[in-house]
Every structure is written in C-alpha cells, then in structure tokens.
Swiss-Prot record:
Binding site for Mg(2+): 42, 229
Cofactor: how bound: Binds 2 magnesium ions per subunit.
Gene Ontology biological process terms in this record: polyprenol biosynthetic process
Enzyme Commission number: 2.5.1.-
Species name: Streptomyces coelicolor (strain ATCC BAA-471 / A3(2) / M145)
Gene that encodes it: uppS1
Cofactor: Mg(2+)
Protein name: Isoprenyl transferase 1
Physiological role: Catalyzes the condensation of isopentenyl diphosphate (IPP) with allylic pyrophosphates generating different type of terpenoids.
C-alpha cells in the first residue's frame, strides 16, 4: 500500500518499503518510537579483515545495508535518521582509502537518490564544504533539491562532518554577528547558539546507535546527543540490518528518560524498600 505525501500543492504516492526477506515485522512501540536515530556505521574494515578481503569490500557491503535500514525505519515510524558517512577525522586515513570513500559515497548518492525519493525520504547533507570533493558536494546538493518536499523520513547524510567542527562553525558565525552588531552578546544562550548549527530544526537525537562493539561517540552530533540514549551492539555494520535497528528501538523503549530530572520521591522510597527486603 502506497502512502501519500505532499509535494507543493499536489499529493504524491510514496513507494511501500520492501519487506525483509525473513518476513520479520517491526515491533509496535506506539509513542515510544524514537523520533531521531543517529547511527555510526562502524565495523566495515574489521568485517573485511575477518574474511581476508580489502577494506574497500567492507564499505561496499556496508552500503548495501543502508537502504534496508532506512526501509526498516520507515516501517517502524522513525521520523529522522542520521548516518555518519565520513568524518572530519577520516582525512587521516590512507590517500587510497580516502579516494575510494569519496568516489564511493558520490556514486552511492547518485544511484540511490531516485529510490530514496520514491520512498518519501528527504535527504539533507550535514558537514563542511572545505576539502569535500566538488563532485560529492554536487551529488548531495542534487539529492537535496530532488527530495526537499518529501515528508516521510528525513535522512541526514553526514559527510565531512564532525561534532566539534559543527559547534566551532556555529560559534564563529555567531561571533561574526556579534561583531557586526546584529547580536547582543549578553543575550547569547543555548537557544541562540543552536540557531547557528547546520540544521537548527534538526530534532535532538533520541537514540544513538553504534554497531561493531565500540562504545564511544567518535565526535558525532555532540550537541544534538546531549540526552540521547546510547545503544551499542556487537554486530559489524555489513551484517547489520533493519532487525538490529528494531532491537535497538526496543531497548530504547525500555529506558527511563528523565532528561536530568530526579526520580520522584515515592519511586526512591519504593526502591529503598525493595533493597532492604
């Protein structure tokens, strides 16, 4: 069954996600579905090494999982997915791997944008322009323009991105407005700075998901992940599919999110009562 979305004043039909080959269906979480899931696609190199293959093969297989995960997110009802495709630190890798990743990401975006558009995915690129290959930036801009009116799922494709870099860029832009007399420094607060981020309307991250067994943020969406629930899985990204995303969403739904607030006194008393029995 196709879903209708809005394109200008007209309505269009979005393509129904293809079911998983196993026949698995997403769990029903109702209001507990995370609105924004940030994913660190980690483990491509280790996956390839375990099989005696070059690192590039891990990246190729890992890319095949992206579309499956996005379709699983649509089935689940997730509104926003952020994918860490290439970080500002990845330039430290060998010239051969950097060249491969630039070419690969450019080709992936070009080949995928029509399918993403049909699925109702809005593509947004987050990252720095300097150093990024012009051919990659062009494909990202074309994908953004083609999908800008889609409203089923927003995909933030983080390319040449770093969390500290984003905050530094925001601070620089804010400082320039202060110097130009457009902004009173005495009135600067968190909300003010947030307006200078790459996408001020990006929802805060609810679920920060990292496969591969590593347990760190790797400088990813630092501002937006202030109160994110962290879920780390041992599966390597090339073996990751929508079922792993669903399992992470189930884990998220079981968490007690207080956003820095205290546990109510009655809950504390109940916990103390249980601990003394």
């Amino acid at each position: 069954m196709a879903v209708r979305g809005i394109l200008g004043r007209q309505r269009r039909e979005y393509r129904t996600p293809e079911p998983h080959p196993s026949g698995a269906r997403p769990p029903k979480l109702g209001d507990l579905v995370p609105e924004h899931v940030a994913i660190v696609m980690d483990g491509n190199g280790r996956w390839a090494k375990e099989r005696g293959l070059p690192r590039t093969e891990g990246h190729k297989v890992g890319a095949e999982q992206v579309m499956d995960v996005l379709q699983g997110a649509i089935e689940m009802g997730v509104g926003n997915i952020s994918l860490y495709a290439f970080s500002t630190e990845n330039w430290k890798r060998s010239p051969e791997e950097v060249r491969f990743l630039m070419n690969f990401n450019r080709d992936f975006i070009r080949k995928s944008r029509d399918t993403l558009d049909e699925l109702g995915v809005r593509v947004r690129w987050a990252g720095r322009m300097p150093r990024l290959w012009k051919s990659v930036a062009k494909e990202l801009q074309v994908a953004q323009e083609q999908t800008k009116d889609n409203d089923r799922l927003t995909l933030y494709f983080c390319m040449n991105y770093g969390g500290r870099a984003e905050i530094a860029d925001a601070a620089q832009a804010l400082a320039e407005d202060v110097r130009a007399g457009k902004l009173d420094p005495a009135k600067v607060n968190e909300k003010t700075l947030a307006k200078y981020l790459y996408y001020p309307d990006m929802p805060d991250v609810d679920l920060f998901l990292r496969p591969s067994g590593e347990q760190r943020t790797s400088n990813y969406l630092l501002w937006q992940s202030a109160y994110a629930e962290m879920v780390f899985q041992d599966v390597l990204w090339p073996d990751f599919d929508r079922r792993d995303l669903w399992r992470a969403c189930l884990e998220f739904a079981s968490r007690d999110r207080r956003f820095g607030g205290a546990i109510p006194n009655e809950e504390l008393l109940a916990m103390e009562g249980r601990s003394t029995r």
